Amino acid sequence: NVLELLAMSFGEKKIQVEDVETAIFRKSLKYDKFGDNHYDILSAFQKSIRGSDVDASLHYLARLLESGDIKSPIRRLLVIASEDVGMAYPQAASIVKACVDSALMLGLPEARLPLAQAVILLATAPKSNSGILAIDAAIADISGRDCGEVPNHLKDAHYSGAKEMDRGTAYQYAHNFPNNYVKQQYLPDKIKNAVYYEPQGNKFESSLKKYWDEVKKNK
């Protein structure tokens, strides 16, 4: 039990009430590793990062690590980098992956260092959920309906007889045009006007939108 373990660790040193309370608390953290409270903490962890509260994010990371769980926060961090930061700071995904790899190689307690770095980065980064909205819109659009064939000019033309079937013959190679762009249809006819990605107002996405608006305005 807790008292026996404390007695073995403290030896002849007097055990204080706060020592017992701390030991019981840490034991309860480990016991609840897969309980409802654990998933509440995981939920609060992601929502705190999404809400850009760096201190709350570190608090919940600490509670997860003290429970002995390293894999759950790692999975959440990888998701958050794409779901909640996303196109506002695309480099976050590779930086977080590097931190995660370091944490897995180091193990606890040193793993807390790269994980804290990843949490601080994500919590303080600009946010965008344009990526998840875009892919979910695309998936919803194709669910339960025929969207049509790939346009002929985009079809594979690397086999004998392809040209006779008009496959790939009208394709325009974008790199042969100014700004590496040429206007041509890429979506199937049935959904040729579909729009899935809507850039959000952060600095990075705004700069991309400005660039492409300028390139495409005279096409």
Q: Residue ranges of each PLM-predicted region?
A:
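Terminal-proximal interaction/regulatory segments of ATP-powered molecular machines
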Residues: 51-181, 188-219
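Charged, low-complexity surface segments at secondary-structure and domain boundaries
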Residues: 4-10, 30, 193-197
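Inter-lobe coupling/hinge segments of SF2-like helicase ATPases
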Residues: 14-18, 27-39, 53
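Short amphipathic alpha-helical boundary/capping segments
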Residues: 30-34, 46-50, 103-105
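Short, exposed beta-strand "edge-strand" segments with a Pro/Gly-rich flavor and a Y/T-containing core
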Residues: 9-15, 145-149
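C-terminal helical "lid" of AAA+/P-loop NTPase domains
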Residues: 1-11, 18-25, 43-47, 58-63, ...
